[in-house]
Each structure stands twice: as C-alpha cells, then as structure tokens.
C-alpha cells in the first residue's frame, strides 16, 4: 500500500483531519454508498441496471454495425453517429457493470487506482460526448444552411480531424480532473455518496482549503460545456430560420426530422449533467445526487439509439437490407 507523501500528511495535520476520526495513512480504497443496503433494493437495482445496460449495448452496437456495413450510410452524419454510439457504449460500460456486481456481491469497495481510473474514463467520455454533439450540430448546420458547400467543407479529412480533436479534448479534461483531485489528501475519508467514482462526490471528501486547483479545473470544464452549448444553440437558431423558409410542408417536416433527434439528445445529456455538476453537493440529499447521476449516466446512452433510429428511414432501410430480402 502506498503511503502519504510528506506534503499530504502535513496538509492533513494542518487542517485538523488526522485526529482519531481519520487514518493517517493514504486511502487505499473507497466505498461506493450510492444505493440502499437492503438486499431487496439491491436486487431490484441490479436487475434494472442489467436490463438498461443490455438495451444500451444492443442499440449502440446495432448502429455501429449498420453504419459500418451499409454503403448507403457512408456519410459524415452517420460517421459522427457511429462515433457517438461507440462512445455511448464505452460511457455506460465505465459505471454500470461495476455497480451491478457491487449490488449482487455486497462488495461496494473499489481500489484507489480503480477509482481514479473510473473517474478518468467517465470525465474523458463525458467531455468527448459534449464535443461530438457540438460537432454534429455544426454538421447539421452545414448540411441545411450551406448545402452547396457541404461536401467540399465536410470531407473525410475534416471529419477525422474533428473526431480526433473531440477525443483528445476528452483525454485532456479527464487527466486534468483526475490529477487535480487524486493528488490531494483524502485524510482517511473514503465513503463516496454515489454508485461510481464521480468527481463532485470525491471533492466532498476533501478539505475545502486544499481544493483550489480542482475548482479551477471544474471551472475550465464548465467553460467548455458553456461554449459547446452556445455553439449548438447558435447552429440551431440558423437551422430553424432556414427550415421555416422552406416552402413545402413535406420538405420542412423531413428537414426537421434530421434535427430534432440530435436536439433531444443534447438537451437530455447537457442539462442533466450540468445540474449534477453545478449544484452544491453538500446542500442536496444523497438520494437526489444518486438518481440525478443515474439519469445522465444511464438514460442518454440508452435512448440515443432509439431517438436516432426510430424515425430514421435510412436506418430502417439499412436494417432491412442487412437482414436480407
């Protein structure tokens, strides 16, 4: 087991946290206290999470397979959708399987390294999802508002670069959060009021006097979300202004059908995630934190395949072609 370095131990002593209430050794593991200790409730939680996880995996893998194999779906729009589906598959896999196992085995512990790794991937994928949703809104803007320039500007090289930048932004943000959080002393506090290692709940374990750096990182991450939200909002303002000028009702309806799913996904993910990160952890009931986190962790990856494919004629046609005559 690794021990506190000298600076961490001094910080704990200075802030009065190395009393008999807390250990003076480094936290070696955390305990996830998200759901009730009742066996019946844990079984229900595990069953619900398993069904939701299964639906999310099947739905997102189906989109990945269809957009990869079908020649009619080799367009920028479906390239971005394929990336989003792969990301959602990874995003829900970071938290849900561990939570299911914990409920079934009564073992809520997670190692210090495992917690840091889970927090990194969660922040990485959440940031990447925001970036990809922003890129997809720009793609819709170009396709609807600048159709004559669309194929020239949104070419294969541009698509690859935008995706690379999206994934890179997630990695950078994930590293920044994890390094800023896990380099600070927990001073023996190791019970997380959540079903996974979430940064806001981890911050509540730290002394307020030593989290200045992490607050700066949180402000940076929030700024990225605000910028993305502004870009998405402006894109759709232009898109809707163009759609309303389309003379035929059928043309407006068809164009709206390509935009509404993306707008619903953006609203679900960004609003729920923003509320969870902006509201003060200490002033909210633990059950509210857990259910809000469950919402933005589970709902978007599960509903995205349904939202994007339920009314999408191209996806339905691709499924029929792949399944045979």
UniProtKB/Swiss-Prot annotation:
Q: Which residues lie on this side of the membrane: Cytoplasmic?
A: 65-72, 139-151, 236-255, 311-325
**Source organism's superkingdom?**
Eukaryota
Q: What Gene Ontology terms describe where this protein resides (cellular component)?
A: plasma membrane
The entry lists its GO molecular-function terms as:
G protein-coupled receptor activity; odorant binding; olfactory receptor activity
Q: Where in the cell is it found?
A: Cell membrane
User: What sections of the protein cross the membrane?
Assistant: 44-64, 73-93, 118-138, 152-172, 215-235, 256-276, 290-310
Q: Which UniProt keywords apply?
A: Cell membrane, G-protein coupled receptor, Membrane, Olfaction, Receptor, Sensory transduction, Transducer, Transmembrane, Transmembrane helix
The protein's topology relative to the membrane is: Multi-pass membrane protein
- Per the UniProt record, one Pfam family is 7tm_4
Q: Which Gene3D superfamilies match?
A: Rhodopsin 7-helix transmembrane proteins
Extracellular compartment residues:
1-43, 94-117, 173-214, 277-289
Indicate the principal place this protein occupies in or around the cell: membrane
| InterPro entries recorded | GPCR_Rhodpsn, GPCR_Rhodpsn_7TM, Olfact_rcpt, Olfactory_GPCR
In the record, the note on similarity to other proteins reads: Belongs to the G-protein coupled receptor 1 family.
Its biological purpose is as follows: Odorant receptor.
Q: Specify the protein name.
A: Olfactory receptor 14L1
- According to its UniProt entry, this protein's organism is Homo sapiens
């Amino acid at each position: 087991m690794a021990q506190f370095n000298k600076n961490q131990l001094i910080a704990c002593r200075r802030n009065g946290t190395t009393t008999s209430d807390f250990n003076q050794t480094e936290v070696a593991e955390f305990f996830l206290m998200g759901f009730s200790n009742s066996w019946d409730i844990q079984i229900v939680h595990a069953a619900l999470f398993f069904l939701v996880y299964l639906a999310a995996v099947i739905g997102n893998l189906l989109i990945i397979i269809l957009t990869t194999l079908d020649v009619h779906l080799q367009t920028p729009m479906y390239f971005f959708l394929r990336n989003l589906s792969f990301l959602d598959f990874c995003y829900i896999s970071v938290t849900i399987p561990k939570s299911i196992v914990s409920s079934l085995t009564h073992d809520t512990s997670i190692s210090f390294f495992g917690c840091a790794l889970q927090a990194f991937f969660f922040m990485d994928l959440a940031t990447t999802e925001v970036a990809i949703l922003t890129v997809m809104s720009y793609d819709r803007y170009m396709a609807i508002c600048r159709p004559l320039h669309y194929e020239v500007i949104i070419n294969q090289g541009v698509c690859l670069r935008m995706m690379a930048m999206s994934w890179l932004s997630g990695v950078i943000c994930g590293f920044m959060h994890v390094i800023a959080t896990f380099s600070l002393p927990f001073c023996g506090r190791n019970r997380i009021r959540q079903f996974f290692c979430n940064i806001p709940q981890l911050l509540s374990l730290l002394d307020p006097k030593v989290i200045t750096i992490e607050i700066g990182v949180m402000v940076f991450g929030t700024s990225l979300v605000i910028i993305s939200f502004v870009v998405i909002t402006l894109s759709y303002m232009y898109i809707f202004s163009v759609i309303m000028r389309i003379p035929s009702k059928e043309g407006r309806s068809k164009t709206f059908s390509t935009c509404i799913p993306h707008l619903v996904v953006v609203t679900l993910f960004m609003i729920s995630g923003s509320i969870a990160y902006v509201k003060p952890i200490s002033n909210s009931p633990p059950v509210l934190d857990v259910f809000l986190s469950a919402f933005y962790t589970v709902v978007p990856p599960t509903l995205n395949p349904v939202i994007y494919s339920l009314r999408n004629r191209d996806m339905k046609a691709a499924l029929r072609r792949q399944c045979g005559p």
